């Protein structure tokens, strides 16, 4: 992978937690907004190049490393069970920039809590599972998708797919929020038979085929970004 240490100078302090041990951890860098992980906030830092801007954003949008698992502590731990690896990880103390995830026994109750808090989701893992390093059926990501209906204001034709341009009406204007795609043989493809009109979107200026916004589609998505577009949208059927 890419070395992104220079983008997050505050995370350089994590090396102090090793205390002369050689560690390999599995986790992710997270930025927070209102006490919750925020993908949009992290995006403000993930592509910076100017050193002064990086240092400025370190203060304005601080990040932390969230540790999910430990793969190595002076020796390979990937063949140990999840519970054994968690014990090895728990010996390391949390700091302002290093936070360990916990194991919860009641997954259903935890997921209900996640939904109430508006968090992204959970990962369910078998307690005795070893670390494979790729997707496996005994590690399941359960995402907290939101659902909303959006107007179809147009479409883009691709080789085998149709990408619908989605919008929502605010103050009499159709505001573009993102795209969802279907295969050309999907029954919803009949929507593109409608008569084309001028671009109905207030904030979408790119090329496309435009329609009168009368059809609505039910769409699932993770969250809205800072520019109000949908993150990971897909058509709910």
Task: Label each region the model flagged.
Residues 1, 97-202, 206-209, 216-220, ...:
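Nucleic-acid 5′ end/cap handling module spanning
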Residues 1-92, 216-236:
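Covalent nucleotidyltransferase
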């Amino acid at each position: 992978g890419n070395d992104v240490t220079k983008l997050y100078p505050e995370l350089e302090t994590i090396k102090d937690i090793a205390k002369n041990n050689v560690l390999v951890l599995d986790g992710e860098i997270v930025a927070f907004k209102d006490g919750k992980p925020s993908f949009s906030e992290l995006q403000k830092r993930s592509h910076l190049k100017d050193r002064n801007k990086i240092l400025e954003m370190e203060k304005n949008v601080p990040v932390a490393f969230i540790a999910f698992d430990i793969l190595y502590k002076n020796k390979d731990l990937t063949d140990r069970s999840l519970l054994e690896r968690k014990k090895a990880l728990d010996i390391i103390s949390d700091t302002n920039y290093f936070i360990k995830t916990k194991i919860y026994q009641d997954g259903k109750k935890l997921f209900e809590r996640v939904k109430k808090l508006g968090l992204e989701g959970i990962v369910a893992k078998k307690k005795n599972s070893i670390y494979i390093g790729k997707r496996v059926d005994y590690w399941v990501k359960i995402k907290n998708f939101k659902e909303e209906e959006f107007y179809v204001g147009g479409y883009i034709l691709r080789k085998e797919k149709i990408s619908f341009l989605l919008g929502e009406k605010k103050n009499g204007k159709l505001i573009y929020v993102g795209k969802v795609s279907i295969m050309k043989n999907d029954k919803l493809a009949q929507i593109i038979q409608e008569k084309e009109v001028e671009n109905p979107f207030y904030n979408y200026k790119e090329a496309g085929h435009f329609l009168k916004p009368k059809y609505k589609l039910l769409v699932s998505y993770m969250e809205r970004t800072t520019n109000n577009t949908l993150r990971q949208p897909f058509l709910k059927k």
